Swiss-Prot record:
Function field: Stimulates the secretion of gonadotropins.
Localization terms from the record: Secreted
Sequence similarity: Belongs to the GnRH family.
PTM sites of type Glycine amide: 33
Organism expressing this protein natively: Oncorhynchus masou
Residues with Pyrrolidone carboxylic acid modification: 24
Keyword annotations: Amidation, Cleavage on pair of basic residues, Hormone, Pyrrolidone carboxylic acid, Secreted, Signal
Protein encoded by which gene: gnrh3
Protein name, UniProt field: Progonadoliberin-3
InterPro entries associated with the record: GnRH, Gonadoliberin
Signal peptide limits: 1-23
Origin superkingdom: Eukaryota
Record-linked Pfam families: GnRH
GO molecular function: gonadotropin hormone-releasing hormone activity; gonadotropin-releasing hormone receptor binding
Length: 82
């Protein structure tokens, strides 16, 4: 490569690196400088005050699982000859 094409490649690389370095990640609900919008913060605080608990509908066919027992008790029940 001659000197002018090397210079062009270096300038392009410098521009790409500068863009990545100085760009800011924008996320939903965030303002420049890493600050959150007040409305979203207020909604979060209200949810925390109420406990943020949602009532789940009860399943009609749900059953309570049997309590787990130690392995040796289970093996004795299944193999009475030991």
């Amino acid at each position: 490569m001659d000197l002018s094409s090397k210079t062009v490649v270096q300038v392009v690389m410098l521009a790409l690196i500068a863009q990545v370095t100085f760009s800011q990640h924008w996320s939903y609900g965030w303002l420049p400088g890493g600050k959150r919008s007040v409305g979203e913060l207020e909604a979060t605080i209200r949810m925390m005050d109420t406990g943020g608990v949602m009532a789940l509908p009860e399943e009609t066919g749900a059953h309570i699982p049997e309590r787990l027992r130690p392995y040796d008790v289970m093996s004795k029940k299944r193999m009475p000859h030991k």
